[in-house]
């Protein structure tokens, strides 16, 4: 029998290996698989492993020139999803050699590049990834991380406060700078470019950078605190993005910003390297994430996108609020918040964490809570997110009836009151409203804010839990 055995064969013969013992160097993936009717789970799980590693639909002559056993992905476990008839979790192990070092782009191209359009599957969702320590070590990660950021800003023992400047489109650069100054003067640590503020006809990036830098130096001089404004460097080309980051550094500002999903991982990693080399903090916005992560049965869970960002690099990332206007289930959100901040995270399925993850001292990322939050949420946010977080109130600052600076004062007073109460041992979950009410006696600005937002609620069930 000369030649090789041509023809199509079942994936599960080669790629379903329930006895496989995973290696410490393997990248492990947990997929939520919904096969087409009539496709057995083992075949669907094996198909995912094959299509995202070495496999193709038929045996090929060149298979004989390589060691499949060394390079193939393996589906090593399958478990049903409780309460879902046609879904199950497929665990796949990928050998480390399949991936380029230090490239989040290549990791995603390999693992999720092709397989999501596969006909034998009705739907597919990547729920979690275990990044082996050997692979983590090929990434620089966040430019600075939580501790270095606190040291640079000289702010300890409390969450940081931010605010997105609104209206997000249409202000001139000078008026935009005015809004920044008022917020920072009132007591915020940071203000933020909206994610879609790049360089539009009504406000070119260079003008905005200049006026925002002026605003933050003025506010710094007045308050004696270090201030920052996230200057959005996101652009149409990598070269233009770097040009903006370089200009920000020349102005001496502390932090720039990037939209990492629309800008892309390659651009983001370049920017993160530049930021570490030049002492800039990097704020990351997750615009477009819901396109990828909102469906329960198809796409990629945000915890995977968050892990990828920690590898690619960013010092802050938006991560939902649990209490505001956007998605976020408490336990699940706290699961990926810990994945961003902590060095070692134990497997915990109740929090959606499928694998134990060791980050081997890669710097941590500050989670940013923003979206429909206001002073009444402060106790809950302080309790849920703890000190290592950035709380961002856009409308919750600028919507204050007396203006931006009093809005900033109200948020700062509310935050300081919550932190003090917590440090005195009071239970924020139980006494939160009372703590805010007490603080209004000392702050007319806070009293006015409490009056405006006392009835606001965003009560809808989270979509990805329905």
Curated annotation (Swiss-Prot):
Record-listed N6-carboxylysine modification sites:
192
Please report the PTM annotation for this entry. Answer: The disulfide bond which can form in the large chain dimeric partners within the hexadecamer appears to be associated with oxidative stress and protein turnover.
Report the NCBIfam families cross-referenced here. Answer: PRK04208.1
What highest taxon heads this organism's lineage?
Answer: Eukaryota
Q: Example GO molecular function term?
A: magnesium ion binding
Site, as annotated: Transition state stabilizer: 325
| Top-level EC class | lyase
Provide the positions where the record notes the PTM N6,N6,N6-trimethyllysine.
5
Q: Which BP terms in the Gene Ontology apply to this protein?
A: photorespiration; reductive pentose-phosphate cycle
Give any Pfam family that matches. RuBisCO_large_N
What protein name does the entry list?
Ribulose bisphosphate carboxylase large chain
| Any GO CC annotation of this UniProt entry | chloroplast
Report further notes. The basic functional RuBisCO is composed of a large chain homodimer in a 'head-to-tail' conformation. In form I RuBisCO this homodimer is arranged in a barrel-like tetramer with the small subunits forming a tetrameric 'cap' on each end of the 'barrel'.
Question: What Enzyme Commission number does this protein have?
Answer: 4.1.1.39
Question: Does the keyword field hold Chloroplast?
Answer: yes
Q: How does the cofactor bind to this protein, according to its record?
A: Binds 1 Mg(2+) ion per subunit.
Instruction: Give the UniProt subcellular location, in the record's own words.
Output: Plastid, Chloroplast
| Subunit (UniProt) | Heterohexadecamer of 8 large chains and 8 small chains; disulfide-linked. The disulfide link is formed within the large subunit homodimers.
Gene encoding the protein: rbcL
Co-factor requirement: Mg(2+)
Q: Which UniProt keywords apply?
A: Calvin cycle, Carbon dioxide fixation, Chloroplast, Disulfide bond, Lyase, Magnesium, Metal-binding, Methylation, Monooxygenase, Oxidoreductase, Photorespiration, Photosynthesis, Plastid
Query: Is Oxidoreductase tagged as a keyword?
Result: yes
Q: Which InterPro entries match?
A: RuBisCO, RuBisCo_large_chain_AS, RuBisCO_lsu_C, RuBisCO_lsu_C_sf, RuBisCO_lsu_fd_N, RuBisCO_lsu_N_sf, RuBisCO_lsuI
Under catalytic activity, the entry for this protein gives: 2 (2R)-3-phosphoglycerate + 2 H(+) = D-ribulose 1,5-bisphosphate + CO2 + H2O; D-ribulose 1,5-bisphosphate + O2 = 2-phosphoglycolate + (2R)-3-phosphoglycerate + 2 H(+)
| Binding locations of Mg(2+) | 192, 194-195
Q: What does this protein do?
A: RuBisCO catalyzes two reactions: the carboxylation of D-ribulose 1,5-bisphosphate, the primary event in carbon dioxide fixation, as well as the oxidative fragmentation of the pentose substrate in the photorespiration process. Both reactions occur simultaneously and in competition at the same active site.
- The residues that the entry says bind substrate are 114, 164, 168, 286, 318, 370
């Amino acid at each position: 029998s000369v030649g090789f055995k041509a023809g199509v064969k079942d994936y599960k013969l080669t790629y379903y290996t329930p006895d496989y013992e995973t290696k410490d160097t393997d990248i492990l993936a947990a997929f939520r698989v919904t096969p087409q009717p009539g496709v057995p789970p083992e075949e669907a799980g094996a198909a995912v492993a094959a299509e995202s590693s070495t496999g193709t639909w038929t045996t090929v002559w060149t298979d004989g020139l390589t060691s499949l056993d060394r390079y193939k992905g393996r589906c090593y476990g399958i478990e049903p999803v409780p309460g879902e008839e046609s879904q199950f979790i497929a665990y796949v192990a990928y050998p480390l050699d399949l991936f380029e070092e230090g490239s989040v782009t290549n990791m995603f191209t390999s693992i999720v590049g092709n397989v999501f359009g596969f006909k034998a599957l009705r739907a597919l969702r990547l729920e979690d990834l275990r990044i082996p320590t050997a692979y983590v070590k090929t990434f620089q990660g966040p430019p600075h991380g939580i501790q270095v950021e606190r040291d640079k800003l000289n702010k300890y023992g409390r969450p940081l406060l931010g605010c997105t400047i609104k209206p997000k489109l249409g202000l001139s650069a000078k008026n935009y700078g005015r809004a920044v100054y008022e917020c920072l003067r009132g007591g915020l640590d940071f203000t933020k470019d909206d994610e879609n503020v790049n360089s539009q006809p009504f406000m070119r990036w260079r003008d905005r950078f200049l006026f925002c830098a002026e605003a933050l130096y003025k506010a710094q001089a007045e308050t004696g605190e270090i201030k920052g404004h996230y200057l959005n460097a996101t652009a149409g080309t990598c070269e233009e993005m770097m040009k903006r980051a370089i200009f920000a550094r020349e102005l001496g500002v502390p932090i720039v910003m990037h939209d990492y999903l629309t800008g892309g991982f390659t651009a983001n990693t370049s920017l993160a390297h530049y930021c570490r080399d030049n002492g800039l903090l990097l704020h990351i916005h997750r615009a477009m994430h819901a396109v990828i992560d909102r469906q329960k049965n198809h796409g990629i869970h945000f915890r995977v996108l968050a892990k990828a960002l920690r590898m690619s690099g960013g010092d802050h990332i938006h991560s939902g609020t649990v209490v505001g206007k956007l998605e976020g289930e408490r336990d699940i959100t706290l699961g990926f918040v810990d994945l961003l901040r902590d060095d070692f995270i134990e497997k915990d399925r109740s929090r959606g964490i499928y694998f134990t993850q060791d980050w081997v001292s890669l710097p941590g990322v500050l989670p940013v809570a923003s979206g429909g939050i206001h002073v009444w949420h402060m106790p809950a946010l302080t309790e849920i997110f703890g000190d290592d977080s950035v709380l961002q109130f856009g409308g919750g600052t600028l919507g204050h009836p007396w203006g931006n600076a009093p809005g900033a004062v109200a948020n700062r007073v509310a935050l300081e009151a919550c932190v003090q109460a917590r440090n005195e041992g009071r239970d924020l979950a139980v006494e939160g409203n009372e703590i805010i009410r007490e603080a209004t006696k000392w702050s007319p600005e806070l009293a006015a804010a409490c009056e405006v937002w006392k009835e606001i609620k965003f009560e809808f069930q989270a979509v990805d839990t329905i």
